[in-house]
């Protein structure tokens, strides 16, 4: 069937900010869809609130709106652009829910807009648990025994029928949000209450437990002519009970017989037909009873998903691109497979001759109060994928790709006595505990009995533990070529072998090199080598023939960001992509190295050559040996590649851009202090300490309060503000790695200072300011968690000019070539330098979207020797509108975790708001972040003594908008003395009715709550913040945030929608 010619313009709804359950994979799918539809001549209109995405680059769509993804905003875009159709299946649950809202509110009918990719009925049938169950029964497939309910009484009645343990699944949510497994009535009531709040339809599925069953996924595509193929089968290492996003998964499925696979395959196709998915990809999840072989359907997603991205990267089949083509009428037989050079049709079912492992990356270290047990609610923040010829090789490569300090099956960090608990109630280290169990002489049968992990997987790990024991009992010289080759085939890294042999990694490498025991590289070709591939999409293994076939062109290698932990998110993938694209255009052959399957950087056509490998020294050096690049870029992937810089230089690798020595000069406290002294620039008083005694002495020299943190960090891990010697002593005794090589940094904390971020770019001769951003939250809140405005909304021009002068001076002094970020604090009109990062940082995408200057592209060209003048980049662009970046937090996923912001970064993503005023931009950023301010109600204020003066303006602003003001007694007295009419409210310990009751009763529209550093004050007010979080009431733990929201609320009835292209067009005309 040819493409539809009745459609001229198509609106794609993106997924919004990166949150747990919905990450970079939708940037990958959305970017593919934009490219596919534009190639076919359609006008593409895009809406997405996330500025850190590739899909929101102005070149990706004809018209791009970085606006909140809510039906009211999208209606304004539809009214302005008049698209013929909407494609909602590339934006995860966010986009599907928005599409259903548009339909339910009559917008689609009003503007005669068609849903393509999935019909409203297909979405509803797949997402509504009751309808889905009926559909499965109709085609003879079983589902777990379940009942859906809309009230707590209905839920209790349903639970009595299904028994304990009980699975609670809210409807129309992502990543299992709000759900869980209950083993008793108290847990059941708590999860149901949370689940009802999470479901937009206030609906729960109360389901029979199938804990311990094996879990499988089938990634399926289907077109309107009923052509269907299975792209990939995926098996979960973890049994049912762990969310598939958190589970270790392998592809293809390893423990199914052919007969079982064919049954599951046929069932998957039947599910798509019955649900009505006929223009795209879907993910169907099954559970299989390991004892009886009974198979049931768990759920399906009628859209591209996290598993779609994994299946695409695992096989090379571009699911999102093909799904976009089907949405406009193409059929499977009409499309060709790009990865085989279009030699094969897209209808050729992929087959693979390697094993793929996906492992999730967690961030529980950021949320110490969170429950780290893995359940049906997703908790991971990122993931890695590894490929190998054996599952053991694949497992071990995935472990070392996680960026958690592992180089294989390192011993788990918990006590021996916890083995049984860790196997029975899995946490983030459960695979290591399987290894630990084998080391402790558990039998495979015992481990299977406790963990329900399939015996075949256990046999693979048992064999690896036997190999480790054999290695550790010998010496390096005992390992001949055959023994080393066997170990490398099983995925053992040089570093892990070195640990087992008590030698250095270098010694192991030097044992391999003379006998030419090097990895070879094999292509991902979708056909298990049946057809030749023209794309260089490669993974390493230890076999005979290398199929990499490197060219003799001038090459630049870009090291990516890995699994995107908190502090190193999608922004760094954006920068990596923006290094590859301009360098390709400039004639270089680009080589990307990364291990994250969710990203655009690991799309096979982003760079000339893609190596899907862990970002470790060993793996990178082997690729360098194979490719012999002219230069390597370590500055765009965050701390992950930056940590390798010195070791790469020591091994003769040419790091282009800012030198490794200059990076060290900026990161090393003593060297950087000398740079600032030479330039006459100020820093807050600071010292370096290598142990507790030295820290206490030097802290007295500086004075309290202090910011303390380890050196060489990203995302502020282990960063705190301490107000006393006792607090510093406690910090030093926590598990923070402090030594001569890794000292702790002590900085005097500047109270009530304004923090400022500056991005700039240099070619080594000239420096251009990219943008100056004023933080909303005061200094002391991690810059990644603070809102920020470009241009600044209250800094004087004189201060901004001084910041420009200091930034350029530091860039010249450090010999900057490429990008640099500087963080300043301004206190009483005095500018202090906080830190300098001579690399790409998380603000680069935001600045680029706000100003139209493609900073990452410009910086990459500078590294390759192309001057700023040659690129036509000679002056700063200052917009005549405001752009506000706001952070998005995962607190709702971690009940009990306090929402107070501090120096340690905890946000997972970001959004951007654009407006004619700072208030409008800030308010839109809050909407994009999911905050919804009720038009009526009361504003609750409870602030510490030093914040009371500042909160007066906030109270007056909200009162002028018609809100009641209800402070706690101390704040109420202060506001009354300053002429405000308020109604005091009790704190929770002061008697009822109290603030907790008011929040539950829906009386409170917004909370502003600041507390002193005193632990008792934090503890006493914790219940207020938790209640606000549970009731989805906007809350601000800084007075600056509350004040900004009070300014923003003035604009709520006058919000416009602005395309990136029209904003950038205005800037070009001005400049």
Curated annotation (Swiss-Prot):
Q: Where does Mn(2+) 2 bind?
A: 299, 301
Q: Where does Mn(2+) 4 bind?
A: 835, 837
Q: Where on the tree of life does the source sit, at the highest rank?
A: Bacteria
Which positions in this protein are listed as binding Mg(2+) 3? 823, 835
Q: Which PROSITE patterns match?
A: ATP_GRASP (PS50975), CPSASE_1 (PS00866), CPSASE_2 (PS00867), MGS (PS51855)
The UniProt record lists the ATP-grasp domain at: 133-328, 673-864
What Gene3D superfamilies does the database record attribute to this sequence? 3.40.50.20, ATP-grasp fold, B domain, Carbamoyl-phosphate synthetase, large subunit oligomerisation domain, Methylglyoxal synthase-like domain
MGS-like domain ranges (all copies): 931-1071
* Pathway(s) per entry: Amino-acid biosynthesis; L-arginine biosynthesis; carbamoyl phosphate from bicarbonate: step 1/1; Pyrimidine metabolism; UMP biosynthesis via de novo pathway; (S)-dihydroorotate from bicarbonate: step 1/3
Locate the residues binding Mn(2+) 1.
285, 299
Q: Which cellular component terms (GO) are annotated to the entry? A: cytoplasm
- What is the E.C. number? 6.3.4.16, 6.3.5.5
Q: Where is this region: Allosteric domain?
A: 931-1071
> GO terms for molecular function, please?
ATP binding; carbamoyl-phosphate synthase (ammonia) activity; carbamoyl-phosphate synthase (glutamine-hydrolyzing) activity; metal ion binding
Q: How is the cofactor bound?
A: Binds 4 Mg(2+) or Mn(2+) ions per subunit.
Specify which residues bind Mg(2+) 1 according to the UniProt entry for this protein: 285, 299
Query: Where in this protein does the record put region Carbamoyl phosphate synthetic domain?
Result: 549-930
The reaction(s) annotated as catalysed by this protein in its Swiss-Prot or TrEMBL entry are: hydrogencarbonate + L-glutamine + 2 ATP + H2O = carbamoyl phosphate + L-glutamate + 2 ADP + phosphate + 2 H(+)
Q: Where does ATP 1 bind?
A: 169, 175-176, 208, 210, 215, 241-243, 285, 299
Q: Which HAMAP family match?
A: CPSase_L_chain_B
Q: What does this protein do?
A: Large subunit of the glutamine-dependent carbamoyl phosphate synthetase (CPSase). CPSase catalyzes the formation of carbamoyl phosphate from the ammonia moiety of glutamine, carbonate, and phosphate donated by ATP, constituting the first step of 2 biosynthetic pathways, one leading to arginine and/or urea and the other to pyrimidine nucleotides.
Assembly information from the UniProt record: Composed of two chains; the small (or glutamine) chain promotes the hydrolysis of glutamine to ammonia, which is used by the large (or ammonia) chain to synthesize carbamoyl phosphate. Tetramer of heterodimers (alpha,beta)4.
Q: What is this protein called?
A: Carbamoyl phosphate synthase large chain
> Which species expresses this protein natively?
Neisseria gonorrhoeae
């Amino acid at each position: 069937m040819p493409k539809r010619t009745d459609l001229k313009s198509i609106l794609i709804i993106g997924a919004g900010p990166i949150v747990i359950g919905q990450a970079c994979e939708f940037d990958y799918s959305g970017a593919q869809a934009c490219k596919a539809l534009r190639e076919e001549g359609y006008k593409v209109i895009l809406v997405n609130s996330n500025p850190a995405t590739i899909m929101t680059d102005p070149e990706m769509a004809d018209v791009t709106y970085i606006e909140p993804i809510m039906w009211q905003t999208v209606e304004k875009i539809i009214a302005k652009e008049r698209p013929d159709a909407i494609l909602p299946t590339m934006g995860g649950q966010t986009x599907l829910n928005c599409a259903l809202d548009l339909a339910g509110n009559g917008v689609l009918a009003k503007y005669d807009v068609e849903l393509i990719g999935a019909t409203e009925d297909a979405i509803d049938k797949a997402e509504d648990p009751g309808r889905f169950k009926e559909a499965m029964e109709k085609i003879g497939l079983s589902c777990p025994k379940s009942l859906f309910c809309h009230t707590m009484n209905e839920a209790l009645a349903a639970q009595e029928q299904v028994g304990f343990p009980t699975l609670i699944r809210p409807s129309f949510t992502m990543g299992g949000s709000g759900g869980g497994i209950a083993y008793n009535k108290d847990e059941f009531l708590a999860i149901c209450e949370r689940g009802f709040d999470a479901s937009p339809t206030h609906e729960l599925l109360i389901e029979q437990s199938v804990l311990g069953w094996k879990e499988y996924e089938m990634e399926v595509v289907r077109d309107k002519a009923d052509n269907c193929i299975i792209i990939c089968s995926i098996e979960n290492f973890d049994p049912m009970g762990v969310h598939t996003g958190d589970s270790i998964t392998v592809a293809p499925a390893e423990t199914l017989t052919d007969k079982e696979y064919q049954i599951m395959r046929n069932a998957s196709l039947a599910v798509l037909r019955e649900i009505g998915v006929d223009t795209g990809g879907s993910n169907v999840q099954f559970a299989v009873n390991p004892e009886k072989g009974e198979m049931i359907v768990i759920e399906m997603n009628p859209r591209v998903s996290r598993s779609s991205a994994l299946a695409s990267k695992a096989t090379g089949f571009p699911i999102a691109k093909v799904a976009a083509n089907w949405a406009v009428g193409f059929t499977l037989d009409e499309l060709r497979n790009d990865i085989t050079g279009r030699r094969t049709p897209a209808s050729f079912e992929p087959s693979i001759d390697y094993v793929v492992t996906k492992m999730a990356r967690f961030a529980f270290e950021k949320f110490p109060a969170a429950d780290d047990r893995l359940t049906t609610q997703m908790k991971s923040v990122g993931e890695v994928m590894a490929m190998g010829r054996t599952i053991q090789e694949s497992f071990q490569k995935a472990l070392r790709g996680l960026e958690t300090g592992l180089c294989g099956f390192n011993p788990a960090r918990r006590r021996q006595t916890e083995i049984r608990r860790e196997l029975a109630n899995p946490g983030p280290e459960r695979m290591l505990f399987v290894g630990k169990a084998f080391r402790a002489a558990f039998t495979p049968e015992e481990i299977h009995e406790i963990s329900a992990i399939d015996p075949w997987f256990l046999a693979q790990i048992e064999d690896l533990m036997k190999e480790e024991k054999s290695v550790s009992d010998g010496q390096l010289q005992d390992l001949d070529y055959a023994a080393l080759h066997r170990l490398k085939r099983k995925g053992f890294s040089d570093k892990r072998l070195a640990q087992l042999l008590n030698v250095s990694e270098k010694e192991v490498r030097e044992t391999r090199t003379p006998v030419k025991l090097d990895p070879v590289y094999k292509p991902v070709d979708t056909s298990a080598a049946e057809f030749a591939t023209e794309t260089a999409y490669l993974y390493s293994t230890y076999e005979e023939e290398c199929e990499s076939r490197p060219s003799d062109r001038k090459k630049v290698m870009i090291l990516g960001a890995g699994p995107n932990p908190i502090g190193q998110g999608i922004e760094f993938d954006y920068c990596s992509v923006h290094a590859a694209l301009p360098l390709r255009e400039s004639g270089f052959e680009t080589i990307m190295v990364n291990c994250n399957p969710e990203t655009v950087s690991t799309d096979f056509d982003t760079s000339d050559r893609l190596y899907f490998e862990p970002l470790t020294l060993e793996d990178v050096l082997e690729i360098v040996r194979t490719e012999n690049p002219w230069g390597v870029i370590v500055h765009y992937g965050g701390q992950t590649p930056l940590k390798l810089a010195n070791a790469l230089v020591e091994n003769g690798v040419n790091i282009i851009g800012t030198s490794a020595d200059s990076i060290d000069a900026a990161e090393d406290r003593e060297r950087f202090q000398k740079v600032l002294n030479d330039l006459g620039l100020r820093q807050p008083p600071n010292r370096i300490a290598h142990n507790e005694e030295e820290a206490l002495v030097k802290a007295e020299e500086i004075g309290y309060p202090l910011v303390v943190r380890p050196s060489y960090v990203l995302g502020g891990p282990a960063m705190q503000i301490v107000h006393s010697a006792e607090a510093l002593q406690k910090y030093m005794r926590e598990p923070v790695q402090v030594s001569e090589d890794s000292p702790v940094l002590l900085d005097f904390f500047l109270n009530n200072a304004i923090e400022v971020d500056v991005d700039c770019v240099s070619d080594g001769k000239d420096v251009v300011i990219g943008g100056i951003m004023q933080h909303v939250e005061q200094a002391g809140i991690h810059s990644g968690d603070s809102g920020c405005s470009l241009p600044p909304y209250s800094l004087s021009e004189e201060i901004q000019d001084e910041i420009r002068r200091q930034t350029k001076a530091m860039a010249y002094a450090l010999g900057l070539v490429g990008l640099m970020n500087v963080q300043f604090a301004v206190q009483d009109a005095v500018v202090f330098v906080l830190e300098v990062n001579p690399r790409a940082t998380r603000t680069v995408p935001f600045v680029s979207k706000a100003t139209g200057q493609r900073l990452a592209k410009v910086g990459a060209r500078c590294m390759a020797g192309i001057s700023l003048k040659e690129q036509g980049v000679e002056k700063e662009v200052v917009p005549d509108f405001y752009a506000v970046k706001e952070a998005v937090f995962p607190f709702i996923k971690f009940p009990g975790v306090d929402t107070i912001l501090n120096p340690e970064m905890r946000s997972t993503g970001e959004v951007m708001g654009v407006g004619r005023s700072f208030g409008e931009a800030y308010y839109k950023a809050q909407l994009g972040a999911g905050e919804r301010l009720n038009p009526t109600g009361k504003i609750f204020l409870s602030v510490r003594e030093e914040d009371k003066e500042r909160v007066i303006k906030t109270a007056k602003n909200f009162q002028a908008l018609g809100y009641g003001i209800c402070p706690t007694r101390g704040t109420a007295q202060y506001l009354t003395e300053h002429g405000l009419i308020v109604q005091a409210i009790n704190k929770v310990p002061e008697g009822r009715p109290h603030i907790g009751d008011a929040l539950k009763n829906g009386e409170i529209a917004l909370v502003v709550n600041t507390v002193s550093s005193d632990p008792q004050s934090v503890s006493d007010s914790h219940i207020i913040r938790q209640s606000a979080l549970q009731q989805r009431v906007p809350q601000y733990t800084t007075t600056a945030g509350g004040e900004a929201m009070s300014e923003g609320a003035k604009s709520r009835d006058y919000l416009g929608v602005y395309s990136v292209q029209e904003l950038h067009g205005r800037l070009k005309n001005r400049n």
